[in-house]
């Protein structure tokens, strides 16, 4: 089976790089997309969600924030603000972030940035979902 290289990049640099990937599944703003070696070149916007990485002897899940994906014949490059494998996610920290975001959303104070709190809640919930996929 032909394989591809997956590289996930954040502002801190490459945080995940793997060769011999058989399938990459991502959530784009237009829906879910699966990519295998030889896929047509594509660029798409990603929404906060997970990346499923299937390789010869297993599957790995990575929580990602909004970003972009570029697909070439044998390479997938994902550019996002944040990315964490399911194993790396600190569940307690994610629960605290969720509680903090929910508290901000419940607060009627005009100083609360509702959009920012909603995004924080979305990211925390995503991290908790992906952590369960270990």
Curated annotation (Swiss-Prot):
Q: How does it sit in the membrane?
A: Peripheral membrane protein
State the compartments where it is located: Cell membrane
Which InterPro entries does the entry link to? ATP_F1_dsu/esu_C_sf, ATP_synth_F1_dsu/esu, ATP_synth_F1_dsu/esu_N, ATP_synth_F1_esu_C, ATPsynth_dsu/esu_N
Principal localisation: membrane
Q: Which GO molecular function terms does the record list?
A: ATP binding; proton-transporting ATP synthase activity, rotational mechanism
Q: Name one GO biological process term.
A: proton motive force-driven ATP synthesis
Keywords, sorted A to Z: ATP synthesis, Cell membrane, CF(1), Hydrogen ion transport, Ion transport, Membrane, Transport
**What Pfam families has UniProt attached to this entry?**
ATP-synt_DE, ATP-synt_DE_N
Q: Which family does it belong to?
A: Belongs to the ATPase epsilon chain family.
Task: Name the job this protein performs.
Answer: Produces ATP from ADP in the presence of a proton gradient across the membrane.
Q: How does it assemble?
A: F-type ATPases have 2 components, CF(1) - the catalytic core - and CF(0) - the membrane proton channel. CF(1) has five subunits: alpha(3), beta(3), gamma(1), delta(1), epsilon(1). CF(0) has three main subunits: a, b and c.
What is the recorded name of this protein?
A: ATP synthase epsilon chain
Name the species this protein comes from.
Staphylococcus aureus (strain NCTC 8325 / PS 47)
């Amino acid at each position: 089976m032909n394989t591809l290289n997956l590289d996930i990049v954040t502002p801190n640099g490459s945080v995940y790089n793997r060769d011999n990937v058989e399938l990459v599944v991502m959530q784009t703003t237009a829906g879910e997309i699966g990519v295998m070696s030889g896929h047509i070149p594509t660029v798409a916007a990603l929404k906060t969600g997970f990346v499923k990485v299937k390789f010869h002897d297993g599957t790995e899940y990575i929580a990602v924030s909004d970003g972009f994906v570029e697909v070439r014949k044998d390479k997938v490059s994902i550019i996002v603000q944040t990315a964490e494998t399911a194993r790396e996610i600190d569940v307690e920290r994610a629960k605290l972030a969720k509680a903090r975001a929910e508290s901000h959303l419940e607060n009627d104070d005009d100083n609360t940035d509702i959009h920012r709190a909603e995004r924080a809640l979305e990211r925390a919930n995503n991290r908790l979902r992906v952590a369960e996929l270990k």
